[in-house]
From Swiss-Prot:
Protein name: ATP synthase subunit delta
Entry keyword Lyase: no
Pfam family, one: OSCP
Originating organism: Nitrosomonas eutropha (strain DSM 101675 / C91 / Nm57)
Family listed: Belongs to the ATPase delta chain family.
Role noted for this protein: F(1)F(0) ATP synthase produces ATP from ADP in the presence of a proton or sodium gradient. F-type ATPases consist of two structural domains, F(1) containing the extramembraneous catalytic core and F(0) containing the membrane proton channel, linked together by a central stalk and a peripheral stalk. During catalysis, ATP synthesis in the catalytic domain of F(1) is coupled via a rotary mechanism of the central stalk subunits to proton translocation. This protein is part of the stalk that links CF(0) to CF(1). It either transmits conformational changes from CF(0) to CF(1) or is implicated in proton conduction.
Its membrane topology: Peripheral membrane protein
Keywords: ATP synthesis, Cell inner membrane, Cell membrane, CF(1), Hydrogen ion transport, Ion transport, Membrane, Transport
Subunit structure: F-type ATPases have 2 components, F(1) - the catalytic core - and F(0) - the membrane proton channel. F(1) has five subunits: alpha(3), beta(3), gamma(1), delta(1), epsilon(1). F(0) has three main subunits: a(1), b(2) and c(10-14). The alpha and beta chains form an alternating ring which encloses part of the gamma chain. F(1) is attached to F(0) by a central stalk formed by the gamma and epsilon chains, while a peripheral stalk is formed by the delta and b chains.
GO cellular-component term (any): proton-transporting ATP synthase complex
Length: 178
């Protein structure tokens, strides 16, 4: 995994610079997302890993599936990745690109896990509090984990805010043991 990220980083940075220069950040997000999902399909993934399939044929297959979604620069990127045997790292390129884009747009990704489904007004209030605290726009991924018993656990950047009942119980247990 770390090796794939290391390989993907220069590609992601180059794509980001290209997208930023041409003002097409959102377009590149869409293109990378679409092609990433296509190559993660098991049938396409098997073709990519097959050494008997020449790169020209692989390029034809990928373009036949998602050519309408790609602009000329997108096609060049896919061709380059195929020629260099790096097409399988496209999901990591997409992930790193999204991180660079979010950083550029001053958007922080937050993962919010709650014990119960949050109402829309609760989520909006929570996001607005996080935006004030971190002084950035916050984009939230929300999930439910009944194991928290109550409350929420928020991961944003490298910080964790655990205001769940299970988190408080674990903290009390650790205090009592010491």
């Amino acid at each position: 995994m770390a090796e794939a990220i290391t390989i993907a980083r220069p590609y992601a940075e180059a794509v980001f610079r290209l997208a930023q220069g041409s003002g097409s950040l959102s377009l590149w997000s869409e293109m990378l997302g679409i092609v990433s999902s296509v190559i993660q399909e098991s049938q396409v993934n098997a073709l990519i890993g097959n050494p008997q399939i020449p790169s020209i044929k692989l390029r034809e297959i990928v373009f036949s599936i998602c050519d309408k979604e790609l602009n000329e620069d997108g096609r060049r990127l896919i061709s380059l990745l195929i020629e260099n045997g790096r097409l399988l790292v496209l999901p990591q390129i997409s992930e790193l690109y999204e991180q660079l884009k979010a950083q550029h747009e001053s958007v922080l990704e937050a993962e919010i896990v709650s014990a119960f489904p949050l109402e829309s007004y609760q989520l909006e209030k929570l996001i607005s509090v996080l935006e004030v605290k971190f002084q950035h726009k916050v984009k939230a991924q929300v999930s439910v984990d009944s194991g928290l018993i109550g409350g929420v656990k928020i991961e944003i950047g490298d910080q964790v805010i655990d205001s769940s009942v299970s988190g408080k119980l674990e903290a009390m247990a650790a205090t009592l043991k010491s």
